[in-house]
Amino acid sequence: MTSKINEANTDIKEDFFRGLHNGIPICLGYVSVGFTFGMMCTENGLSFLVAVLISLTNLTSAGQFAGTALIISGGSLLEIGITTFVINLRYMLMSLSISQKVDVALSIPKRMLMSFGITDEIFGVSMQTKGNISFAYFMGLMILPILGWSGGTLIGATAVSLLPDMVRSALGIAIYGMFLAVIIPPARTERAAAWVIAIAAAISCILYYVPFFSGISSGWMIIICAVAASSIAAVLWPAADEEEANA
């Protein structure tokens, strides 16, 4: 009995440290983006404590940036809520996918804790795991990225005042680089993805430059562009059924 317990504890430790190791590259990538977020917050009047708290409780990259930008611009609660919901809706699908690879006996509190740490990168790495995803592995995988995201936010929020204006201006475009890194790879391989990007960009330009739509806030523009572009793509380029894809 004792040997079995020791073996189980060893497996848990091995899974945890394997996840910790796999989370290192994600952590390093998140530091730079978190730095940009922290800089954005303090330059727009939010304290570094608020910036770090947002990062610790969100961990949603694009949704976090969009939601915070709306807070800074004075957007309504409804506007902020719908915008972040639409942008973060993909996490529901990721959670459903991961739920198929965890032990059915895993408790709901542990499942909820795992769902908190799901990001695009963590999801991608975890889904490459052969067999089931253990709770210990996922905890190890999400710890360093959370620390990297929050730590980067803290550094950016506190150190930005020490940087020259030229450097601060250059770092300000880092978020756009992050978004380009997200959309360009799928656009190069999937025609539908490229069209979704083009349609969303066209709608955004119309809403921004046509005087008739000048009363629409940036938050509602994001919602309209996302819903309209994805709806058009769903009609014109519906996803093939699994049976058709495997045929």
Where are these regions (language model features)?
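Short, Lys/Arg-rich, polar N-terminal cytosolic tail immediately upstream
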Residues: 1-17
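Helix-loop-helix junctions within the multi-pass membrane cores of secondary transporters/permeases
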Residues: 3-8, 81-172
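Transmembrane alpha-helical segments of multi-pass membrane transport proteins and ion-pumping complexes
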Residues: 30-39, 62-65, 88-96, 121-125, ...
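Membrane-interfacial helix-loop connectors
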Residues: 43-45, 49-50, 54-89
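Selective transmembrane alpha-helices of multi-pass membrane proteins
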Residues: 88, 168-198
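Loop-to-transmembrane alpha-helix initiation sites
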Residues: 168-173, 215-228
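Extracellular/periplasmic helix-loop-helix junctions in multi-pass membrane proteins
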Residues: 189-194, 206-223
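Membrane-interface capping segments at transmembrane-helix boundaries
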Residues: 235-247
